[in-house]
Amino acid sequence: MGPNDHGFAYILIFLLLSPPTHANRDANRLFEDLIADYNKLVRPVSENGETLVVTFKLKLSQLLDVHEKNQIMTTNVWLQHSWMDYKLRWDPVEYGGVEVLYVPSDTIWLPDVVLYNNADGNYQVTIMTKAKLTYNGTVEWAPPAIYKSMCQIDVEFFPFDRQQCEMKFGSWTYGGLEVDLQHRDKHLEKEIEEDVEGVDGPTKEIVWVVDRGIDLSDYYPSVEWDILNVPGKRHSKRYPCCESPFIDITYEIHLRRKTLFYTVNLIFPSVGISFLTALVFYLPSDGGEKISLCISILISLTVFFLLLVEIIPSTSLVIPLIGKYLLFTMVLVTLSVVVTVVTLNVHYRSPTTHTMPKWMKRLFVDFLPKYLLMTRPQPPGHHSKPNRKFDSRASTFSIGVNHVLGQNSELLSPGLNSNREESSFTLPRDNSPVRSAVESVAYIADHLKNEEDDKQVIEDWKYISVVMDRIFLITFTFACAFGTVVIIARAPSIYDNTPALA
């Protein structure tokens, strides 16, 4: 080992064995002197009747979750306390100029400020961090905490809703005459009167309000909620049991939901499915898929409704906005099933089962189509007279019969020749081949004419069903559009342009 190595070893041993620095000795001596006769179980006041003022402010770090189903808000906060402890004063000159000292918080008296409306039974802070002591006796303590607080969810306009959640803090043990809990920004307080529901009905109560009661300087923005306002309200209430008032500071967190997620995943699909209801009436009845489409739409809406039930709390106070829209759409789909059954019944009617009333033909065949912009196509070769084909067949048949009978005039009775121009004749009474042929041809002609008439009636029934489909198509399209606008547009947050604080 060379001389340089010996020198390094001496320096290292000196550093290890050297006593603490002067500052550390002073801080250690100060801590021992302060804690020597200190009783952390006793309220730090010089006289028993003296009131200890504790200033308190909430610093919101993160809004972790707002659980609508369980009505619980989870937050990550810092609880900023400050008070004067006369037992923790010292003269910096006597302790080497030490003006600030950090001590474990479990070695000094602490105010038992807890969250009253917690939802999981955890009233205390998460970590007992160190407290900051100043030579004049000021104690500052800002422990972090993750709280689950109760929050009554208003689902009336979900998912375009705004919520108001509260966090109520107060001393669990001391009354207002022993510990006066005040907001740290007391200089910004304003006094107002507030209506409060009491045991004997609504009463007026004096409340001290700080508009920006929560510190949002280190807030991490939420992906689901905008914070609109964070007032802090100080209440001083007296109860018949006690002489001392009980003081609490209630922080209100006004939230507005960011609607993009629910708009894309819930609103748009619901609106699209509702408009499919109208398209049912655009399908041809011969396809046989109208009822199937209606039932499929109804099942889809039921799935969305079950999804909504899993999200919102089980409340019977009000129906949420999206729930009203889904119910409205389900009613429309149910009506579309009923109407589709009626139109299919009309579509498949025939002369053997139903007789078409004259008013129905005039209304649905002659009157309504021109107002619905519908034009019925004419069959090929159709002219002004609908039964011209049968008239020509009858004329051909008459000419043929007259030709045959003209060559066999002895078979005709005298009345036949005299009335030939009226196409009436009398066949002989015997069963001649000519008589049988004429009767057969006449029967065939009548049968063809009846078939054509029946076919025309069937086509009229089908056309009436098409007209009904057009009427219901227009009606349901208008109903879907009108219902969508009226129901969705009722949400006040759609028109809310209030800038978010965070």
UniProtKB/Swiss-Prot annotation:
Residues 347-470 are cytoplasmic. Expressed in body wall muscles, in vulval muscles and in neurons. It is a multi-pass membrane protein. GO terms for molecular function: acetylcholine-gated monoatomic cation-selective channel activity; transmembrane signaling receptor activity. SUPFAM superfamilies: Neurotransmitter-gated ion-channel transmembrane pore, Nicotinic receptor ligand binding domain-like. The chain crosses the membrane at residues 264-284, 293-313, 326-346, 471-491. InterPro entries: Neur_chan_lig-bd, Neur_chan_lig-bd_sf, Neur_channel, Neuro-gated_channel_TM_sf, Neuro_actylchol_rec, Neurotrans-gated_channel_TM, Neurotransmitter_ion_chnl_CS, Nicotinic_acetylcholine_rcpt. Disulfide bonds join 151-165. Glycans are attached at residue 136. PROSITE patterns: NEUROTR_ION_CHANNEL. Keywords: Cell membrane, Disulfide bond, Glycoprotein, Ion channel, Ion transport, Ligand-gated ion channel, Membrane, Postsynaptic cell membrane, Receptor, Signal, Synapse, Transmembrane, Transmembrane helix, Transport. Residues 24-263 are extracellular. One of its GO terms (biological process) is positive regulation of locomotion involved in locomotory behavior. Residues 1-23 form the signal peptide. Component of nicotinic acetylcholine receptor. In muscles, composed of 2 non-alpha subunits lev-1 and unc-29, and 3 alpha subunits unc-38, unc-63 and lev-8. In cholinergic motoneurons, composed of 2 non-alpha subunits acr-2 and acr-3, and 3 alpha subunits unc-38, unc-63 and acr-12. Interacts with lev-10. Alpha subunit of nicotinic acetylcholine receptor (nAChR). Probably acts in cholinergic motoneurons to regulate presynaptic neurotransmitter release, thereby ensuring normal level of excitation of cholinergic motoneurons during locomotion. Involved in nAChR sensitivity to nicotine and levamisole. Belongs to the ligand-gated ion channel (TC 1.A.9) family. Acetylcholine receptor (TC 1.A.9.1) subfamily. This is Acetylcholine receptor subunit alpha-type unc-63.
